[in-house]
Structure formats: C-alpha cells, structure tokens
Amino acid sequence: MTNENLCAGRNRYDGVSIDFFSDADLRAIDSATMDVFQNPGIQVSDAESRALFKEAGCDVNEKTMVVKIPEHVVRRAIMTAPSKITLYGREKQHTFTQQAGGKVHYTCFGTGVKMCKYEAPGVFKTVDSTEEDLANTARVCDWADNIDSYSLAVSARDWAGKGAQDVHETFTPLMNTSKHFFHIDPVGENVEYYWDILKAYYGGDEEQARSRPIFSELLCPTSPLKIGTNACQLILKSVNFGIPINVISMAMSGASCPVHLAGTLVTHNAEVLSGIVLAQLASPGAKVWYGSSTTAFDLKHGTAPVGSPELGLISAAVAKLGQYYDLPTYVASTOTDAKVPDGQAGHEKTLTNLLPALAGANTLYGAGMLELGMTFSMEQLMIDNDIISMGKKVMKGIPVNDETLGLASIQKVGIGNNFLAHKETRDNINLVSSPDIFDRDMFGDWAAAGSKDIATVAHEKVTEILKNHEVTPIDSDLVRDMKAVVDRADADFRSSM
C-alpha cells in the first residue's frame, strides 16, 4: 500500500481555508517518518505493547526496548482507524461527530495546575487549582456556546497524595457538564476505575458504555520517539473498553525534536502514529485522534511558548497531516504566554486560533489558558468564547450567490438612501457578528457604563454564570453508584501507601 492511497490533505468543508503544503510536501514528511520508524525506531517501555508490535512483524530489541515498525504495518493501522468519531455528551444536543477534513470544533484548555483569580480591575493572583475549580470550569464551559466539549481544564491538586486524584478528575467533570469530556493525562493502571464510573452512569449496561462513551482519554508519547509504560497501558486498556483515545505529542523544536519545523513534524508524526498503530494492533477499528501540543522551544528564554506563530503553524500543519491520513485531529490553539487577560493574550490567542481553524483541525483546544499552559482563567475563557465566535465568522468567508449579491435591494433602495429599513436587512439582523462581552460602544457610552476593562466585564459574566447556570443533573441513584467507584479508588489508594 502506497501513500497515494491516502487523503491528499485538502479540506472538505465550505468557507475560507488555507493550504500551505503541497501534496509533495506531505509525501516528503510521510516518507521521512517511515524512515524514522526504521532508523532509529521507537522506544516502547511496556513489555505487553512490545509483544503486540513483535506479533505484527516489527523488529523488537528487548534489551533497548526499541521497536522498528515496517511501513506496511503503519499503513494497515492508518486504514483500520476510523475517519469519523462521534463524541457523546450526556445530552443529545451536545453529541456531535468529527470527521477528518470536516467541521471545526472547540474545547477549553487542559490541563493547568494553577488558577488566575480576578481580584479587582488590573489585580490578579495565581493559586494552586482544586477540585472546586475543576467543577467551576466545567460549569462555565457547559454554559459557553462556542465550547463544544470539555477538556480537563485544571488538576484537582487538593487531592494529590490524599486519594485517587485522577479518579476525582474523571467524576467531577461528568457531574458539572453535560458535554463530552476529554480526560487529559490519566493513569494507565486506573483505567478500570474510569470504566466502572462509565458503566455506573449507564446503570451497569456495558454495551451502552462501550457504544456511547461520554468521555475520551488523552495521552502523550515522550519526545523524542518514546512511548512510556503509562501511555501504552492507557492505549491498551482504553481501546479494550471502547473508550476513544487521543494521541498527542508535546515535542519542542530545538529541544526534543529538530529545530526546523519540517523536522519537528517528522518526529511528531512518528510519535503520534506509533501510538495509533499500537491502538489498532490492540483493537482494529479503535477510535483515535491525531493530536498535537507541539511548539517551538525558545532558545533565548529557555521556555516553550504557546502563544507563538510556530505553535499556530505546527497545529495547522498537523491538521493537514491528519487530513492526509484521513484521521480526525485535536490540536493546540487559542494559546498565550501572557500571565493575565491582557492585550498580549488577545493577540496571541487570535493568531493561534485562526491558523489551525483555517487549516481545518477538528478540535481546537486552548480556551481559558494563560502562562504558557500552566494557568487557567475563567475570565480569559469568557474572552476566548468571543474570540472563537469571531473566528467562526471568518471561517464562513463571503458567500457569493444571487441572494448575497443583493442586486434587487440595491436597485430598490437606489442612490443616496440607506438599507436600515429594508426587509432584507431586517430579515438578516443576526447575520453580522455579535460578541457576547466585547465592547462596541463609542467612548462616551463606554465611560458612562463604568469604563470597565474587558477582564472586569468577563469577571461579571463568570459570576453570573456560576450563580445562575444549572447543569443537567444525573439521576441520584446513578450518582451514588458513580461516587462509590471514587470512594473505592480512594480507599485503594490509601491502602497502597
């Protein structure tokens, strides 16, 4: 099977899009990746996973744990992986399908370890995130109409060392949003607990739990070119239960991958595809995303910026690679290195949002993020909800047809008159973009309303949502059974200490 059988990396949706790779470029990245699979190969820490690779015909060195994957094994895995995934929410209106090259969706950032708390205009503080913060971020995302699913926004750090933190991080989001939930960086040995929570939600019906999972698992290979034991076990156990998985590389060009972005894409591609291959070897047809949180390492500052043009370019490139392989994509976007909601955040988030969106990535994650991905801000989430809304308007472009050309209305209104009272204008009052919290008043009206900066307006909105928004509840009997799994996990954790 040759790569000519694969998708050519072109968008299949209407509207504005960008194609910055030629087909020859995509084939070159793909070909270099196949070379990497042979030399130097992929180090696989998990013995069970190495056995699967060996059984499939891969060259496995048990001493070095390096696996060399033949091209035909990679091609077969790509072909068995589905190009379409349905993300089930607790409510029907929050269930949607993603397809390679299809519609763009959005989720919040995950996973931060701090919260940026608004105290007064221009005054913020950062604190360690807690389970309460996790619940509140889920509730606000449940309200936000431009956030289609919920990613684990912050860690429940108040459970660290006290109980099964990751199991709490499974249960709490499900209680506080009816949207699909991406569980980020969970624990491989605890997948059975996650599965038991899912079964309990469906009243013990395993068939329903397998066919309609309301959460997915996100895992990361270790750059460069390693898949650790935890990631391997997450793959093997999750696909066994029918839980979709998201393989997402977090490489840094110039540090854990080549400094040139084309080379970055080669190692990124090898890392993600190796995880996808493992998933398909374990369970052909397993639902997988091709993911990215890869960026460029800033060699002058010693940081990995996420508000950079490089992150936007890499995420857009990954969208094209996903289309090339006919796989749904999940990429970093709407990102910033700013510490508080400010002008830097607005610029960086708009840039890193539009690039992968116009390239056709299926899920863009990053809303609410601050400080290079360390911190989450509810106020920034509100601002990003508007940034995403405006980005969606850009993606629609300018349709040209008999209706939109408006020749009849131009001739009826004539010279020197206005179109405000025209029926066509009244019928399309919602056609123009209308942000929820961005201010479009003149200075005098803005001053009369209190001269509030955008973070203050966003804070007021967050306060209102947390006070008034009601998440669709889960039946109390089901909650009891789900909570019993969490309690059991906590007890097991404490007994193992």
Curated annotation (Swiss-Prot):
InterPro entries xref list: MttB-like_sf, MttB_Methanosar, MTTB_MeTrfase
UniProt pathway: One-carbon metabolism; methanogenesis from trimethylamine
Any Pfam family the entry gives: MTTB
Catalytic reaction(s) noted: Co(I)-[trimethylamine-specific corrinoid protein] + trimethylamine + H(+) = methyl-Co(III)-[trimethylamine-specific corrinoid protein] + dimethylamine
Single annotated GO MF: trimethylamine methyltransferase activity
Top EC category: transferase
One GO term of the biological process aspect: methanogenesis
Superkingdom of this protein's organism: Archaea
Alphabetical keyword list: Methanogenesis, Methyltransferase, Pyrrolysine, Transferase
EC number: 2.1.1.250
Family, per entry: Belongs to the trimethylamine methyltransferase family.
Function, in words: Catalyzes the transfer of a methyl group from trimethylamine to the corrinoid cofactor of MttC.
Name listed for the protein in its UniProt record: Trimethylamine methyltransferase MttB
Species name: Methanococcoides burtonii (strain DSM 6242 / NBRC 107633 / OCM 468 / ACE-M)
Upper classification of the organism: Archaea, Methanobacteriati, Methanobacteriota, Stenosarchaea group, Methanomicrobia
The gene coding this protein: mttB
